[in-house]
Amino acid sequence: MAKYHLYDENYDHKGNFKTIQEMRNYLCEWKYDNNDKTYMDDTFDFIKSIKWHWDIEE
């Protein structure tokens, strides 16, 4: 089973997620906590726009 890892702009590990939806939910909470009112159409485009990174472990 794949596992997704999310890192911020400093490559600090932000979390492990079993699904892309779990990672998206985390990012939605992050947006809310940071008062980010931008629209997130695509999870991976949003990660790139905030200069974060992700990796997949199979």
Label each region the model flagged:
Residues 30-58:
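Short, mixed-charge low-complexity intrinsically disordered segments
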Residues 1-13, 22, 29-30:
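Short aromatic-glycine-(Arg/Gly/Cys) micro-motifs in beta-strand/loop hairpins
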Residues 22-24, 35:
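Generic alpha-helical propensity signal that fires on short helical segments
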